[in-house]
Amino acid sequence: WLGMPLALSLMSRGWQVTGSKTTQDGVEAARMCGIDGYPLRLEPQLVCDAEDLDALMNVDALVITLPARRTGPGDDFYRQAVQEIVDTALAHHVPRILFTSSTSVYGNASGTLKESSPRNPQTASGQVLKELEDWLHNLPGTSVDILRLAGLVGPSRHPGRFFAGKSAPDGQHGVNL
């Protein structure tokens, strides 16, 4: 819901895009759109054919759109998977890494938030993202950019599903979808 629309947007601006999908159907769908697609699974180590991995890492910039799960295999799995991807990119001398984080690193802060605003995550996934951001900022030999995304909605991400069965004590308080 994020990677494919981003890839298509970049391609419409003339960028060559190489990407990974976890299923062969996903790889074929990406290729049908003109994306140089390859299969890759995270367990949390990378499971990928060596030639495909070389193609995936032969890029000017690596964009990581792997979402931190609120439920699922767990925080350690996510942390290890992201670190495995980044370590592999560094071994392949990828010069630039763009990591999609979340405004959940700010916790329950309200008002206008800036990059320099204090991070105080209130969820396990927010804490893992904060730790990964810190780790990424300290990597030598590569340029790292971190985007803290919020409010991602679309055909497969309807806002109502995030609020179903929950009470909102303060209707004026910001929410992170």
Set out the residue ranges of the language-model regions.
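Conserved beta-loop-beta element that borders a ligand/cofactor-binding pocket
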Residues: S102, E133-P155
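Short-chain dehydrogenase/reductase
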Residues: D75-R79, E115-D134, V175-L177
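A conserved pocket-lining segment of Rossmann-fold NAD(P)-dependent short-chain dehydrogenase/reductase
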Residues: H158-L177
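N-terminal Rossmann-fold cofactor-binding loop
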Residues: G19-Q24, R41-E43, G151
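Conserved Rossmann-fold cofactor-binding substructure of NAD(P)-dependent oxidoreductases
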Residues: C33-V59
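N-terminal Rossmann-fold NAD(P) dinucleotide-binding loop
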Residues: G3-M4
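Conserved Rossmann-fold NAD(P)-dependent oxidoreductase catalytic core, especially the SDR/UDP-sugar
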Residues: E84-Q122
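NAD(P)-cofactor binding segment of oxidoreductase domains
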Residues: M57-L98, E131
